[in-house]
């Protein structure tokens, strides 16, 4: 009856309609996957053992009634704050009892299902703990553990760095810590409102203690910003300590589960021992010892950046799974009259919108793992360092420097990439992507702060760009540089490299393309830098002039890193059965990256205009190839429906049924009249018009 | 005392600190503007009369207690829905009493301050009304007006097009309207769950009537999708009519003020007269007359698109104002030791992040006005059309076609641009951009649905691209084409044009650059199209193969349109005093657009690699120039603090004071213990550990 044949689909002689077909279509799609999905999961997780552990933890979370997320998207700020507190309490028990690696896995999984809880825990275990461990002595760390910081008993720490007037520029913080020699105390003070500590996660409701960043002032001399532990609330009744004012920062774009607050200190006295003294020391007489390298002090800040690269993969995989599953069951428009409508995944344009993002999400994982491992190795070295081991110290210092710049670029571009994935996958789901119950809106609002906190992405990128130029300068002087920029050494051979008819599907050639592009940008910027210095500018001024170039350098260098790490991980770790499917993704990622930035390759002369056509054809080709196994690729992420938490992205593909059901469960059919019917709607809609009450004038 | 000199600033011999300086800095910045801001406002508003009217309406809104937005960002879904209803009721009174132009102005202004209210009104006055006026006869229109549709008395209309399973593909909708000759009625029915009307704004709480898109079936023959008016609720008690089921769609990413619902029809009988019969007619005997051109039926859909281009400007100007004002008072990092920290607006990189967006927001206005005028002219022609005026009909049909494709591309790229403006300006404000009280989060969540509804942006773009290829095909056959693509006529002269040493600051050259780029893309795609047709594909199939090219074509063509319209409006309307400031913006916009898409111009050979360096230098140069007068450019938008609704973006620049105050007003200092202290926090944080209760075994 319907000439557009939109309603009915025949599969193996059986008829389905728009409502009943999706799960059948999903089963068909799933059957297309030719590679062993389970093996892909092991590859992604770094081995079967990890997969099994993840699955165990996922089950524990899902079964716990406290982690039921059925009404997650309908909670208001007050409700989500309380629930988050309960979840934090529950999770802290695991921290006490379980091995560190399991805890990390659990947190990472929670981070997919409930970003607020993840962060509220992170405020204490990541930021507070990290600062005390990273900048306190072993004795100090032990002291705060003995007070309850280890298992959150009579203790909850927060991290007071940012002020209303200062964020990125730590050196500009204005809170003061003046040493009072008479009493052997520091006096912590907020000089004016713009120096109020601001945004402090955990401060508004939870924290009993905080690490404070404040200017150390001894005998009138300002030693710059150092870290101190300050007690905020009295133990047991949770009232504020004398001299502490705290307010609630209230509504945020997202992450309402975290109780961000502001803190003002009014001449709060703390014992001298509360200065965290691993690097900076003040003795009873007010003698001050400064650290050998400022960056060591902030080493703990790297932790967050490294884990954000990994979070970007975790959250990205959730949303690319939803959009690709939906694309496999959603039909819209028929391209051939009389034929059923086309699945949107079969539109070449839709493939181009989503499949490069799938490849990107895979790529993020490889690089995050690589940098994560580098980070762990460096931290171990740092912990093992003997106080008088000069050579060892130098090595650690240079590793930390490398980590700083690598993690800066990676944090920035991964968190942006993930934001982009959430945004683009939402749009790829049309109107249903805008439903609260499919999770995109909430996740975007929660996610994007990752681009701002723990190092604003733009500032990180600029500083990564600065480090790249510094490396090039070092190389020119014959000094050693870190691994991440070692390709710059071969720069002279690369500078004028061209494709020259070589294959654009050869990983080596693709990596080379990116090395040429990155190398040229960095070296051109370095030329300019040296010229500016020659003209008498100081380093800061010269870098300022080159900010746009620094951004570009960091961008292209980081993309190179992602591409190289992807190919290299396939090379070293992928079994035969999954090698080709992984290569297809990696090639798609590298080629699409070139297409997106084609001006770069044309400009550098590595490619000619006709090569860009080839790149486009290849992107199309790999889209077509990857499209066939999208369900395999996304199933390999191994997220259960609990973690997906979006009815249109359910495993079984029965999207309309789950979605309709979800909407109705959360909004049970009640009175067709809204709650404000009597108060507002009725008096308006069913009003009687009043006559204009004009007094008649006797004008005759 | 502070070697970084971050805290204090000296201005005219007087010292200010981080907290007190901002308003002084703002006054200084404001004084820099060299052009007459008021004249710029007139230019933007299209004349002094419009400005005065806008100001009058703004004052009326601001003073109305019902429109007080002090706690806007803290309202939950239930509260915002009720408030929105009250505001809709209030605004409907203006619709009754005021001239159409004033109403439009009022709605547009409301759209800046409260997008939900704007849309909830729009559901009736835009969508329902538009459909009845556009596809009903004059008698039918009059009938529904007489029922109360004109002033929302005992009448509230909604618009039921989309179904759970179908959105963009109107032709695939599955709701049926079967003509029952016996009773002279249509029977409206929802055949299965996926055919449930979905997303219908106003359905859940408010609507008494709806326009339904349903398949017209007469004597077993399916005539495709037509529009019908159906009553949903009984008048006076607001209960559901027999056969109507309605549910609440609940939580959305944003726009919670609108009561979107789903509707199922179970054999609902409506009189034959409820088919909207301007184009499609069914008589008593079941004879069906079809319209001359399907597109005329959907002509009313263009209204929304045209106004969305204008909305993009309206909302974009609010957020670019906030970010630029903040950038003028926020200091972070000192570039020269001992000097005060730098205002972030003075970082070249920050200028590049924001100033091209400022130019973009200006550009949107020029094009939106131009297309708006074209639209009004066409609608007038359409209304004046005599039934037997063949020539007139042809002209209108060709105008409507042109409007369809122009408005499609413009709607897509403007709404995306505005989303980008909100997102990037938020990031430019660092952490404070994430505060609920600065409005970015709410606005983004509310805004982005504009990219999806009333024509999904991607689909619109593809269809605009299709129209461009069709125009090129027509041109090749010597047929006439619309104004918007007339530059394709000169294509042969342009195809191989190069910059050839001409100035990149000559508007003519810049417009030519974009015409060459757009022309080449369109013509290459047209070559491919003709080749595919030659190979035996039908048009749909050929267009499918060329989807990526269609997207590119629409993108570049639309950018050309924005650039050309900007220069031309300056040329024809700007007085001397504001000409240069406007040109600076337009040049920045055109040059930055080239830089962003440099691959395009290199590929087409219009520019050479060294020209790209010139473009970059010029972008830098115009950023520096425009930077000096940013406060003037943004003040010219003439939005009061009420419409800005972001303390960090206030007119007086006293950002920290307003922000601190706002946060504390909305979150008054109460108990330092959270509401869930007794229930959740205390039992956890102050728990006594239980001993592990292990039964001792007598194992000896
Ligand atoms: C939800 C949330 C939770 C947070 N939790 C905590 C917490 O628990 N503890 C804590 O201490 N902090 C916390 N923060 C603060 C966060 O770390 C800062 O917001 C972040 O570091 C950015 O600093 P800022 O906001 O001061 O931005 P700014 O440094 O003021 O930057 C503003 C803008 O200017 C640009 N800019 C600045 N300097 C330069 C330059 N030199 N060159 C070019 N551009 C420049 C930036 O890119 C940015 O766009 C939180 C923030 C948020 C939003
Ligand atoms: C908040 C809200 C309010 C709304 N209010 C109303 C209302 O009052 N009345 C009403 O009738 N509707 C309403 N809508 C529905 C809205 O108009 C539709 O969601 C919109 O038209 C998109 O249709 P869809 O969701 O079915 O997406 P689909 O058409 O299913 O598209 C899904 C995805 O597939 C892609 N795609 C589809 N076809 C193709 C193709 N041929 N080629 C390439 N890609 C393709 C699209 O780009 C999109 O990314 C509302 C929606 C929302 C979110």
From Swiss-Prot, chains A, B:
InterPro entries: ACOX_C_alpha1 (IPR055060), Acyl-CoA_ox_N (IPR029320), Acyl-CoA_Oxase/DH_mid-dom (IPR006091), Acyl-CoA_Oxase/DH_mid-dom_sf (IPR046373), Acyl-CoA_oxidase (IPR012258), Acyl-CoA_oxidase_C (IPR002655), AcylCo_DH-like_C (IPR036250), AcylCoA_DH/ox_N_sf (IPR037069). It holds the Pfam family ACOX. Its cofactor is FAD. Keywords: FAD, Fatty acid metabolism, Flavoprotein, Lipid metabolism, Oxidoreductase, Peroxisome. GO terms for biological process: fatty acid beta-oxidation using acyl-CoA oxidase. It is found in: Peroxisome. Its main location: other. Belongs to the acyl-CoA oxidase family. This is Acyl-coenzyme A oxidase 2. It comes from Yarrowia lipolytica (strain CLIB 122 / E 150). The lineage of its organism: Eukaryota, Fungi, Dikarya, Ascomycota, Saccharomycotina. The gene is POX2.
